[in-house]
């Protein structure tokens, strides 16, 4: 029934909105949730759905940071306009590694790692990395405390870390936040740049997935359009709150709790897989 599918879409939209911005892997969570609560749709639609609903989450970034990201915003000084254009150039530079490396190999990684055990291993591994990085940085002073002082080289290196998220379960936001902190930015700068970098990255990735879906001869039924719309709208609304929460959270806390969460979740998934396949 359509109402059941829409309720599933609503819940998946909540999952996307929460996990897209927290460093815990949104795609991994969507895949895992659908292990227990599957959409009654074709495999090709579900694969496209898991990526395209990220557009709802991205719109939240644009709404929240529109004035900051808009170089044509009335009232901006010449210096502010210049800094805005420089920020966009840094974002574009950070996208280059994904275009050159992640994009050509995306289908291969999706075919070989888009399963529960690889996702669980990625969750656990980067959970330990988060904890290690936070312990290492506990008494270190960040070298970059404002986006305006971030160099183009630093932006490029953060983009290189983003490539790691090609492996399901890694987390795009997690990879870029980790990379930024390791390189020497503050947590606030790492979070903000992660939000901004997501705009072209996820618009491009979602757009490519949608185009591929239609080029393969698929069409969207009215029911599927409603499912996609509901999930995207919910992801947008939830993201508005989660982004504000995270920007406030990183001012007073580190990311250790997310590392611990990843380790616990990954361990439970491995245990679940063993129970299902061995007993």
Curated annotation (Swiss-Prot):
Entry EC no(s): 3.6.1.27
One Gene Ontology term of the molecular function aspect: undecaprenyl-diphosphatase activity
Transmembrane feature ranges: 45-65, 85-105, 113-133, 188-208, 226-246, 255-275
Enzyme class, UniProt record, top EC level: hydrolase
Keyword rRNA processing applies: no
A GO BP annotation: cell wall organization
Compartments where found: Cell membrane
Top-level taxon of the source organism: Bacteria
Membrane topology type: Multi-pass membrane protein
Swiss-Prot/TrEMBL keywords: Antibiotic resistance, Cell membrane, Cell shape, Cell wall biogenesis/degradation, Hydrolase, Membrane, Peptidoglycan synthesis, Transmembrane, Transmembrane helix
GO cellular component: plasma membrane
Catalytic activity of the protein: di-trans,octa-cis-undecaprenyl diphosphate + H2O = di-trans,octa-cis-undecaprenyl phosphate + phosphate + H(+)
Main location per the UniProt record: membrane
Pfam families tied to this protein: BacA
Reported function: Catalyzes the dephosphorylation of undecaprenyl diphosphate (UPP). Confers resistance to bacitracin.
Family: Belongs to the UppP family.
Additional notes on this entry: Bacitracin is thought to be involved in the inhibition of peptidoglycan synthesis by sequestering undecaprenyl diphosphate, thereby reducing the pool of lipid carrier available.
Protein name according to UniProt: Undecaprenyl-diphosphatase
Organism this protein belongs to: Streptococcus agalactiae serotype Ia (strain ATCC 27591 / A909 / CDC SS700)
Record lineage: Bacteria, Bacillati, Bacillota, Bacilli, Lactobacillales
Gene this chain is encoded by: uppP
């Amino acid at each position: 029934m359509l109402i059941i599918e829409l309720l599933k879409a609503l819940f998946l939209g909540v999952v996307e909105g929460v996990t897209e911005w927290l460093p815990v892997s949104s795609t991994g969570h969507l895949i895992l949730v659908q292990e227990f609560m599957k959409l009654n749709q074709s495999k090709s639609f579900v694969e496209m759905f898991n990526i395209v609903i990220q557009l709802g989450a991205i719109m939240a970034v644009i709404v929240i940071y529109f004035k900051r990201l808009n170089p044509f915003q009335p009232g901006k000084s010449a210096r502010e306009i210049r800094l805005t254009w420089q920020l966009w150039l840094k974002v574009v530079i950070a996208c280059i590694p994904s275009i050159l490396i992640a994009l050509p190999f995306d289908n291969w990684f999706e075919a070989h790692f888009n399963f529960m055990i690889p996702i669980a291993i990625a969750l656990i591994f980067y959970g330990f990395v988060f904890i290690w990085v936070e312990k290492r940085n506990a008494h270190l002073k960040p070298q970059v405390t404002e986006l305006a002082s971030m160099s183009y080289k630093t932006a490029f290196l953060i983009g290189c870390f983003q490539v790691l998220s090609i492996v399901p379960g890694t987390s795009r936001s997690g990879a870029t936040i980790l990379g930024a902190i390791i390189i020497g930015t503050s947590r606030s700068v790492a979070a903000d740049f992660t939000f901004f970098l997501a705009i072209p990255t996820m618009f491009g990735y979602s757009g490519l997935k949608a185009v591929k879906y239609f080029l393969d001869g698929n069409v969207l039924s009215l029911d599927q359009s409603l499912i996609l719309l509901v999930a995207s709208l919910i992801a947008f609304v939830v993201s508005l709150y989660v982004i504000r929460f995270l920007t406030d959270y990183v001012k007073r806390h580190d990311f250790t709790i997310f590392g611990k969460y990843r380790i616990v979740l990954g361990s439970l998934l491995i245990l679940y897989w063993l129970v299902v396949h061995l007993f």
